[in-house]
Amino acid sequence: AVSIIQGIHALEQLGVDVDYVEAGVDTSKYYPALVDMCEKGYDLILTISSNNDDALVQVAEEYPDQKFINLDDEMTEPPANVYIMGTKNNEMSFLAGAAGALKAAELGEDKIGFVGGMDIPGINEFLVGYIEGAQAVNPDIKVATSYVGSFTDTAKGKENALLLYNSGLSVIFAAAGQSGLGVIDAAVAQGKFVIGVDSDQAEALKDSKPEMANVVITSAIKNIPENAVKAVDRAMKGEIPYGTREVFGIAEDAVGIAENEFYEKLLDEKDRKQVEELKMKVVGGE
């Protein structure tokens, strides 16, 4: 939610008049919200996430002259008036895995954890990148995995994380939406560490819940504000290939990891340099 609001402010600075509706996680609200926006006659409607795919496809068919951009979706064959921006989740999670493995090494451990929201392809893309990144710095590292079964169950997220922490590891990558807050809560309780997802979770928590921010080594982030500005700028220039999905990664600055004060505090400088070297290899196509 924080990154989306940042995106709105960034668009306003671009000189675009922006209105928005927060539909939350209740999928029944997506269709009426999209219809209402179509009826108001906006030049362009932005959405985010694959949770609203059914509603988006239906509304796009009902309003064929309305243009839509989804800033973060897995849909591969969108309607002719819909453009999908995808992100290379495996690239940002690759860096997260490297950071996690290096932190584990600092602690004398060769095992890290992963808590996913659900056992689905989009989340498993995070897992694959995480494992590959960890193995890039320690080929013998072990990765313990767990799925919450929900993106909104913080209690279950905490329960799963506690089981992993109690198995003898100290670092968990939480790709679990709101359930990930339960993982962070477990880290605080156990004196362990977390890698966040989607947005800079330490930055989002540092004022309201500093004890939680202090256990977030970094976050695998999607640069939604920047991606929104780039997409709208292209739309204004008539350069958007509607009816297609394009995927962007580290090279396009569409994804990355949070390099903030907590990252500098919780990961040694030599290890941060190693993560940066791996990042440059990804940018170079290695």
Give, region by region, the residue ranges found by the protein language model.
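A residue-level marker of the well-folded mature domains of exported/periplasmic proteins
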Residues: 1-286
